[in-house]
Amino acid sequence: MAKTIQAIRGMNDCLPTETPVWQWVESKVRSTLASYGYSEIRMPIVENTPLFARAIGEVTDVVSKEMFTFNDRDNESLTLRPEGTAGCVRAGIEHGLLYNQEQRLWYMGPMFRYERPQKGRYRQFHQAGVEVFGIANAEIDAELIILTARLWKELGIEQHVTLQLNSIGSLEARANYRSALVEFLQQYVGLMNEEEKERLLKNPLRILDTKNEALQQALNNAPKLLDYLDDDSREHFARLCAILDNVGISYEINPKLVRGLDYYNKTVFEWVTTALGAQGTICGGGRYDGLVEQLGGHATCGVGFAMGLERLILLVQEVNKAIPLPQSAVDIYLIFAGENTASAAFRLAEKVRSELPHLRTMMHCSGGNFKKQFKRADKSGAKIALVLGESEVQNQQVVVKDLLGGAEQQTVALEAVIDHLKTSFKE
């Protein structure tokens, strides 16, 4: 027997028993974004490697350690996308969507990072992302946060997520803060592991979200980024907080929140939860006003967020016990037997699908006697079985059997079966 081939570690199948909750969550994401007037954009999952190196930052963990990168046959370096913002900006520049325009865009799909697989974090994972271009003021930052808060209500998780906010200011303000932070951290090098020492040299702000408990304690006395903000960033952040206060969105200001990608400036935010054990991020984002120009476009401000669907779905399943999922994949199961019944059965099945498209109709195609077919019908979870034998075909009739309610089966004229089904599924 040949050795079986299995999925790559950290890249998981989504089975038929799992897809209904995915479809429900995805539909809530789509409908919420549509209600705010956002438009879908779809980008390739493979991009030229320099796109991510330039956008995300050479010294970030994502670029230096986590990307799936390979050379194609022309020896060009390509990368499976680790996030969606860079590709969305690239598409916007390439197709002339950004210059002197406002755009509100969203996307959904797989991303790839070479991480150690664990619950809610995989090497192939899925994100829903939103990117807004051409709007500089704090109102759009607020809209994105209000939008996510509405989505949490739609998903039934609003009591289990907390909004954390920070402003990381301009590039100049951040450079000044970086110098002060490095000077402070020098006295704690002895507490750092090798990875943290490397971050101290290359990307010291990333030490602020360390999991090292001793270092976390020391960081309580570290300089605060908010104290180094430029006036424009300070006013922008104050305006955002005022809007959120006025519309009743609760938040915590987290001075250690910096996000893991280099392109952010001013506002950064995360929605976090403790309902899955240790605190985990469900959604994160912020402003990236220099990214479009950095990638070769005209100077255009931007702001966005992304949410990891695997972790979001884990949270939904953990705290929302009233998800309206279908109990089976089938509503009507059509069975038939006899020499000349197949054609009539196909015609009936198509008639039902045409006139009752909201009902899911499955036709038995694997043969066998009626007893065997009824077993399959019961196993399918269908509410109704439609039965055609030679006599029914000859008399233009169909037998309707209630598989769940125990009602007596009825013989119905073929021309009346649609009305009969409408009544059955209204009850």
From Swiss-Prot:
Disulfide links within the chain: none
Cellular compartment(s): Cytoplasm
GO CC entries: cytoplasm
SUPFAM superfamilies on file: Class II aaRS ABD-related, Class II aaRS and biotin synthetases
Enzyme class: ligase
CDD domains, per database record: HisRS-like_core (cd00773), HisRS_anticodon (cd00859)
Domain of life according to the entry: Bacteria
E.C. code: 6.1.1.21
InterPro entries: aa-tRNA-synth_II, aa-tRNA-synth_II/BPL/LPL, Anticodon-bd, Anticodon-bd_dom_sf, His-tRNA-ligase, HisRS-like_core, HisRS/HisZ, HisRS_anticodon
Catalytic activity: tRNA(His) + L-histidine + ATP = L-histidyl-tRNA(His) + AMP + diphosphate + H(+)
Keywords, alphabetical: Aminoacyl-tRNA synthetase, ATP-binding, Cytoplasm, Ligase, Nucleotide-binding, Protein biosynthesis
Main subcellular localisation: cytoplasm
Gene Ontology BP term (one): histidyl-tRNA aminoacylation
Subunit details: Homodimer.
Homology family: Belongs to the class-II aminoacyl-tRNA synthetase family.
NCBIfam families: hisS
HAMAP family noted in UniProt: His_tRNA_synth (MF_00127)
This protein's name: Histidine--tRNA ligase
Origin species: Mannheimia succiniciproducens (strain KCTC 0769BP / MBEL55E)
